[in-house]
Amino acid sequence: MAKQKQRGTKAKARRTIKPTLYYEIVGLTLFALSIITILQLGVVGKSFVLFFRFFFGEWYIIGVLGVIALSVSFVIKRGWPNLLNKRLIGFYLIVLAILMFSHITLFNLLTKDGAVQNTSVIVSTKDNFFLEMKKGPDSVHLGGGMFGALMFATCYFLFDEVGAYIIGIILVILGILCITNKHIGEVLAPVGRILRSQFQVMQGDYKDWRAKRTAEQTEKKKTTRSTRSKRAAEQEEIIEPMEEISIDPPIISNFTENYPVNEEEDKRIEVEQEELITSPFIEETPPIEEPKKKRGEKIVESLESEAQAPPMQFSNVENKDYKLPSLDILKFPKNKQVTNENAEIYENARKLERTFQSFGVKAKVTKVHRGPAVTKYEVYPDMGVKVSKIVSLSDDLALALAAKDIRIEAPIPGKSAVGIEVPNSEVSMVTLREVLDSKANNHPEEKLLIGLGRDITGEAVLARLNKMPHLLVAGATGSGKSVCINGIIVSILMRAKPHEVKLMMIDPKMVELNVYNGVPHLLTPVVTDPKKASQALKKVVSEMERRYELFAHSGTRNIEGYNDYIKEHNSQSEAKQPELPYIVVIVDELADLMMVASSDVEDAIMRLAQMARAAGIHLIIATQRPSVDVITGVIKANIPSRIAFAVSSQTDSRTILDGGGAEKLLGRGDMLFIPIGASKPVRVQGAFLSDDEVERVVEYVIGQQKAQYQEDMIPQDVLDTKQEVEDELYDEAVQLVVEMQTASVSMLQRRFRVGYTRAARLIDAMEMNGVVGPYEGSKPREVLINDVQEKSS
C-alpha cells in the first residue's frame, strides 16, 4: 500500500509539472524558429520567410518579432498572454495602417495613373507572391502583403484612395491613444502650448528685426563718429529705465570690500550694519525696570529665602587670566575679483525684460543686488500684472538666462517688486573671519552673537541666539550643515569665556563634534551614545527646573535679572556667589536620537523649547533627514528660528520652512534663514570654516583653561533592561505590533490563535522590554518603537 501511494504521488507530480513544461517547450521552439527565419537558414527558414511575407509583405519582420515576444511570454509566464489588451490593440491598428500605406505606395508605382480597381488589388498581390515563390525570397516587392491588400481594397472601394489615406491616419491616431492611454485633448494640449509660445517668440523676434533694420538704415547715413555716439546713447538708454522708479542707481553689492575707505563711508556702513543688527530676529530686548528697594532690607530677605533654594549647579568661578581668542587665528578671505560682472548683469537684465515682453508681461528691472553666490534682480511689474504670472515663468526665465535654477521671491517684503535670484557664474567664498570682523559684531556684551554668513546684498548676517531662542538646522548631506554648526560653535568660543557660556554637545555620528572634547566651555564630554543622549537632555531639563526655583526664591524673572541680582549681592557681601552661565545644547543629528528613544527625546526637547529661554538654555538641533517623523509638529511649533540648506524635494522644504524654496538652493553653504518673527526667509551664503581653523581655535581655548566637567550633568551608562523571553512567538508578536502600530491581547489571540493567558504574557513581556506602553484602560496600548528601530535592533 505504501508503494502504491508513493507511485500515485509521483504520477500526480508529473501531471502538475507537465503544463508548465509544455509552455516552456513551445516558447523555446517558437524562439528558435524565429531566429532561423530572421537568418533565412535552410529550407525551413526560407519557407517561414515566404509565409510571413505573404501576410505582411515587406514588413514581415514585424510578424517575426511578434512571434519572438510570444515565445518569451510563454517561457516567463508559462501561460497564454492576453493578446487583446488595450495597448496591443493600439499596436495592431498602427501596424495595419503601415501595411496599408505600403500597399498604396506599391500600387501607385505599378500603375501609371495611380488608380486601381478593387478586385485587382488582391489578385495582383497573390500573383506577385507566386512569382516570388519561383524566384526566391525578397525577389519581388510585395508592399504590405495580404493584410495590406485587404485593407487597401476595402478602403479604396468605400472611400477612394484619398479616403484610404485618411482612414490610415485615423488608425495611427487611435493606436497612439490606446498605447498612451490618454484622450486627444491631453495629447494635443502640449502641442498647442508649444505652438502658442513659439508664435509669441516669433512675434517678438519680428519686432526686434524690424527695430534692428530701422536702426541699420539710420546708421548707414551717419559717420563712424556719430555711430559711436549713437551706441553710447543706446547703452545709456538701457541703464536709464533701471533708474526711473528707484531713487538710487542699480545696486551691485561688492561684498569683497570688507573695510571702509574713508570716514564718511565708515559712518554709512556703520548705520547700515546697525539697521541689520536691529532686525526682528536679533532685536534687543529693553532692560527690565526693577522697583527701587533699600539695599539693607530686601537683599537680606531674599538671601534668607535663597538659603532654602536648591544648590547652584555651577561652582566654577571666573578665570581672570583667561583671554578670548583673537580673530588672527582665523584665515583672511581671498578676494577674488570677478571680471565683466557689470556687463553680465546688464545683459541678464535685458534678457529678463525681453523674456517678459515675449510673454506679454510688462515689467522693468530697476535694481540689482550681487551677492556671493546669487544675484538678485528687482522687477517692478506694471499696474494690472499678476504676480502669479511672473512666478509661472520661472522655467522660461531660467532657459533665457541659461541658469541652473532660479528662485522667485514674490513679492519682496516691504517692496512692491518681485525678486528674481539667479546663480552667479563664479561663486565667491565667504569666510567666518570677514563675518565676525564686520561692524555688526561690535557688541562685546552679547555673548551669544553668532555669525551665519552674508546675504544677497553682501551684508554680514549675525543673530543673537538668546533672542531666537532656539534654532533648527536641516539639509541634505553635503549641503553645508556641519560647517554651519562649526561656525556657530566657534562664534561662541570667540566671544564668551567658560564661566559665561556652557556647552553640551550631542553627536550620535561620533565624527563631527569630537574635536571639541576638552574645551573648558563643555559641561560634559561630547555625548556620542544615543542612549545616553536622552539622559543628558533630561539632566538639562532638571537644571532648567532648578534655575526656575532660584528665580522664584530671588524674585527675578530670567537669567539676566538673576545675574544682576547676584552682582548687587556680591558688591555688598563678602560671600561671593557665582553667576549663572548660559547653556547651549547642540544636537548634531536628531534622526539617530529619534530612532533610539523618540518619546523621551521629543519630550525633553519640547520642555526645553517651551520653558528654557528665560533660564538661559538654548537649543541648536541639526538633522540631515527632514521628514515628519524626525522634525515632528511639536518640535517645529516650539522652534521658530530655522535654517534650511539644499534639500532634494519641495516636501522636505515644507517640513523645514513650512514653504518651498530650499529645493532650489545651490548647496555648498547656500541657505534660507527664517528668524523668529520674520514673514519670509532670508537667503544667506553660509560662512566657511576649515578644519584647520577649528583645530587652532580649540587648541588656543584649551591652552587658556582646562575643562572642568560637571559631574551631576554627565549621563551615566544606560543598562539594557531587556529580558529574554522563552516564548517562541515573541519575536513574531513584536514584529506584528510594530507593523500595526497598535497592541492588544485580543489582537494577538486572533492572529496567532492562542489563549488569553499566553497573549497576556506576550503583552507583559513587551511592556517590560519597552516595546509597548502601560495599560490605559479602554485605550489601546501605545507602541513605543517604529519599524525603523525594529530593523536596526
Curated annotation (Swiss-Prot):
Pfam families: FtsK_alpha (PF17854), FtsK_gamma (PF09397), FtsK_SpoIIIE (PF01580)
InterPro entries reported for this sequence: AAA+_ATPase (IPR003593), FtsK/SpoIIIE/SftA (IPR050206), FtsK_alpha (IPR041027), FtsK_dom (IPR002543), Ftsk_gamma (IPR018541), P-loop_NTPase (IPR027417), WH-like_DNA-bd_sf (IPR036388), WH_DNA-bd_sf (IPR036390)
Keyword terms, alphabetized: ATP-binding, Cell cycle, Cell division, Cell membrane, Chromosome partition, DNA-binding, Membrane, Nucleotide-binding, Transmembrane, Transmembrane helix
Disordered: region residues: 212-235
Membrane spanning stretches: 25-45, 56-76, 88-108, 136-156, 157-177
GO CC, alphabetical: plasma membrane
Keyword ATP-binding (UniProt): yes
Nucleotide-binding is among the record's keywords: yes
Record SUPFAM superfamilies: P-loop containing nucleoside triphosphate hydrolases (SSF52540), Winged helix' DNA-binding domain (SSF46785)
Sequence positions that bind ATP: G478, S479, G480, K481, S482, V483
Ranges per topology, Cytoplasmic: 178-793
Topology in membrane: Multi-pass membrane protein
Biased composition (Basic and acidic residues): 212-221
Principal localisation: membrane
GO biological process: cell division; chromosome segregation
A GO MF label: ATP binding
Domain FtsK: 458-654
Localization per Swiss-Prot or TrEMBL: Cell membrane
Swiss-Prot/TrEMBL domain comment: Consists of an N-terminal domain, which is sufficient for the localization to the septal ring and is required for cell division, followed by a linker domain, and a C-terminal domain, which forms the translocation motor involved in chromosome segregation. The C-terminal domain can be further subdivided into alpha, beta and gamma subdomains. The alpha and beta subdomains form the DNA pump, and the gamma subdomain is a regulatory subdomain.
Complex and partners: Homohexamer. Forms a ring that surrounds DNA.
Function (record text): Essential cell division protein that coordinates cell division and chromosome segregation. The N-terminus is involved in assembly of the cell-division machinery. The C-terminus functions as a DNA motor that moves dsDNA in an ATP-dependent manner towards the dif recombination site, which is located within the replication terminus region. Required for activation of the Xer recombinase, allowing activation of chromosome unlinking by recombination.
Family membership: Belongs to the FtsK/SpoIIIE/SftA family.
Protein name: DNA translocase FtsK
Species whose genome carries this gene: Bacillus cereus (strain ATCC 14579 / DSM 31 / CCUG 7414 / JCM 2152 / NBRC 15305 / NCIMB 9373 / NCTC 2599 / NRRL B-3711)
